[in-house]
């Protein structure tokens, strides 16, 4: 147990173009080797593609996608008397958003296609329409929690 003060949560500053914290959080997930401008360019291009295809505000589409992907419950391993149980716990809002962003970037990288911006745009649009791999991941997480409901009394 640490004797020091707990670290304060640092919230991401809004991005320069959309003035959105969500976009800047996504930028950090896309970022590789410290190339932030490249990550921002990929995201802005992806949002332009979303705007072109849906003819609506891309920020609203992104927020809807994140809302659709955000899990409500997840399982956490808890060791009790020599055996490990998968204990379902509720996901806090900030962690849920983080998981959603992580899944969007992971599954957009795994997609087939030419550019990362195109793959990211497709994943965002799929998530907004409640299809795609990131939605499947959320459903799988919920199924795991449902299956292990019996161990909920081991909650932290």
From Swiss-Prot:
Signal peptide stretch: none
Pfam family, one: Ribosomal_S7
Cell location: Plastid, Chloroplast
GO terms (BP aspect): translation
Keyword ATP-binding carried by entry: no
Family annotation (CDD domains): uS7_Chloroplast (cd14871)
GO molecular function: rRNA binding; structural constituent of ribosome
Primary location class: plastid
Keyword annotations from UniProtKB, A to Z: Chloroplast, Plastid, Ribonucleoprotein, Ribosomal protein, RNA-binding, rRNA-binding
Domain of life (superkingdom): Eukaryota
GO CC, alphabetical: chloroplast; small ribosomal subunit
Bridged cysteine pairs (disulfide): none
Annotated family: Belongs to the universal ribosomal protein uS7 family.
Function statement: One of the primary rRNA binding proteins, it binds directly to 16S rRNA where it nucleates assembly of the head domain of the 30S subunit.
Quaternary state and interactors: Part of the 30S ribosomal subunit.
Listed name of the protein: Small ribosomal subunit protein uS7c
Organism, as annotated: Porphyra purpurea
Gene: rps7
